[in-house]
């Protein structure tokens, strides 16, 4: 999965410099969010997040916050428990 996140980091960079439209990035973002709902992916991210760009780390941390908020408000009943 680290390879996927390396690709996501590159895609986020391309989005930030204007090579990807917002709707393209949001499609990637939905994939990232669905992956992060799996506990082993969350662990992988926690163990290797520092090897990604600061901007991408911030974006993923925002996605993690969204997941936690969704779980707290009962919007994701089947989501793996997020620490």
Locate predicted features:
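Amphipathic alpha-helical "stem/stalk" segments
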Residues: 1-83
């Amino acid at each position: 999965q680290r390879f996927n996140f390396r690709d996501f980091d590159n895609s986020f960079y391309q989005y930030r410099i204007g090579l990807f439209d917002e709707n393209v990035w949001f499609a990637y973002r939905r994939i990232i969010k669905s992956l992060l709902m799996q506990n082993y992916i969350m662990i992988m991210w926690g163990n290797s997040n520092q090897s990604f760009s600061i901007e991408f780390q911030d974006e993923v941390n925002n996605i993690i916050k969204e997941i936690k908020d969704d779980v707290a408000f009962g919007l994701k009943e089947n989501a793996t428990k997020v620490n």
